[in-house]
């Protein structure tokens, strides 16, 4: 079900101290937006209504967090949830930011200087209706290569999903993008790790009897990347001289 337009969302976000109003202007300087810029930076890609971010960020004031989603009508809900969580913890929200961004264009908003130590991807769109849409998955190699550019070797990506096909495909995506899977489970709640924070979606799927799949992947050296963009692969496979060299000019 599509979420209705919320006319109050943008004005309320613009009045929020931890909302990044012009995210396109901060490439190379994201750390400077925080009260303690030398702290590690962790991203949640597709933060949705903020159920995960609002739990995690107040627990770790020694880490800076950025929650990203594409629309204000979703982000406004995250803003309110984060505010309530910090108020309950009696803490200032000075280690958390939220921003409206298209994650598929992340490389145009961040630079390698914006060192990201960890990324969380929780219950993202599986894009499973047809094979051509798979490239939009947040765990597809073309996306993972964007994240790699921001992350030092050894940094980690935490991924959770209810979708079987997305998870199985992701088990191939991560290694192809040079990310070693160091831990995985097809039933997160069977032996739930202490670090897991259940989101609204997670609770809903669990109540329906749908197992939650999860993994942790660690960025390896650039030499471990095996995936090649299809257009680039075609270029590499084309004989020297192009089509003329392959079979001559017809006609």
List each language-model region with its residue ranges.
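A short glycine-rich, Lys/Arg-flanked "PGG" loop and its adjoining helix->strand segment in the class I
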Residues: 138-153
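Conserved beta-strand signature within the Rossmann-like core of class I S-adenosyl-L-methionine
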Residues: 154-161
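Conserved SAM/SAH-binding beta-strand->alpha-helix loop
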Residues: 71
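SAM/dcSAM-binding transferase cores
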Residues: 1-38, 181-251
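Class I SAM-dependent methyltransferase "Motif I" SAM/SAH-binding loop
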Residues: 46-50
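S-adenosyl-L-methionine
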Residues: 80-113
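Short alpha-helix immediately C-terminal to the canonical SAM-binding loop
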Residues: 75-77, 167
């Amino acid at each position: 079900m599509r979420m209705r337009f919320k006319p109050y969302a943008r004005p309320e976000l613009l009045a929020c101290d931890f909302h990044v109003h012009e995210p396109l202007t901060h490439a190379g300087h994201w750390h400077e937006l925080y009260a303690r810029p030398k702290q590690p930076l962790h991203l949640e890609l597709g933060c949705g209504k903020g159920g995960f971010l609002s739990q995690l960020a107040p627990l770790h004031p020694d880490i800076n967090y950025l929650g990203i989603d594409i629309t204000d009508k979703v982000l406004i809900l995250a803003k309110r949830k984060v505010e309530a969580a910090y108020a309950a913890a009696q803490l200032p929200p000075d280690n958390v930011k939220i921003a409206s961004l298209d994650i598929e264009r992340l490389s145009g908003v961040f630079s390698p200087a914006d060192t990201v130590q960890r990324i969380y991807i929780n219950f993202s769109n599986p894009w499973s209706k047809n094979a051509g849409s798979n490239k939009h998955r947040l765990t597809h190699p073309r996306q993972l290569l964007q994240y790699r550019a921001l992350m030092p070797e050894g940094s980690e990506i935490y991924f959770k999903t209810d979708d079987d096909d997305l998870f199985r495909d992701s088990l191939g995506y991560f290694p192809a993008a040079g990310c070693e899977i160091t831990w995985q489970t097809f039933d997160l709640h069977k032996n739930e790790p202490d670090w897991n924070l259940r989101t609204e979606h997670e609770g809903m799927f669990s109540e329906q009897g749908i197992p939650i799949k999860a993994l942790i992947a660690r960025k390896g050296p650039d030499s471990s990347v095996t995936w090649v963009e299809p257009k680039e692969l075609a270029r590499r496979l084309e004989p020297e001289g192009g089509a003329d060299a392959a079979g001559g000019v017809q006609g």
